[in-house]
Structure formats: C-alpha cells, structure tokens
C-alpha cells in the first residue's frame, strides 16, 4: 500500500471527506487517480468509494500495528504503563483543541475518533 493509498483508506476509516489526508500530505490529482485505481484493482473500491473490504483491510492494518506495539507496553509492565497514561491523557483534549483552533478539525487524524456511522 502506497502512502497515497494509505491516506485514502484512512480517510474512509475515519469518515473524513474523500481525499483529505493524501491531499494534506501533498498528493496531486495524478497520484490520487493512480491510488484509486490500485485500490480498485485490489477490490477495495465500489462506486468511487472505499468499500467494506477496504475498511476491513484498513482495520487489519490497525490490528497488526497494535499487536506489534504491544510488546513495548508489555515490557514496561502494567503499573508503569498505567502511570504513563495517567500522566499524559489529560493533555490530549487540550492538545486537540489547540490543533482545532489553529489548523482545523481534520489535522492530526491519528488522534481522532472515527466519524463513520
């Protein structure tokens, strides 16, 4: 999966408008057309939109990433991990509010909840 394809899949995963993520990272029309064609060839597109198969693939990537990252947290242990989360979690909403005010509500998609219904 190319970076542009990943952006399109993530847009759909989060319920973002069309091609917002890849465009925000500099993708041009030609790159977007190619990425849509490549996703379509994999069976991930129906009527110009990422379909359920594409969303399932994106979820598989999310699950695999979580699995790979889990080792580091297990190494720290439950107590240290909990302490870390308790330390940093209160700043998340403050950080996102600042991003929203300065860059808009789509920036920092990795920190956003899905808007899909």
Predicted regions and their residues:
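Basic amphipathic alpha-helical segments that dock to polyanions
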Residues: 31-45, 54
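Inter-helical turn/loop segments and adjacent helix faces that build the functional surface
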Residues: 18-23, 43-46, 68-76
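Accessory beta->alpha helical hairpin/"wing" motif in late/C-terminal subdomains of nucleic-acid enzymes
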Residues: 47-66
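Terminal interaction helix/tail motif
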Residues: 71-113
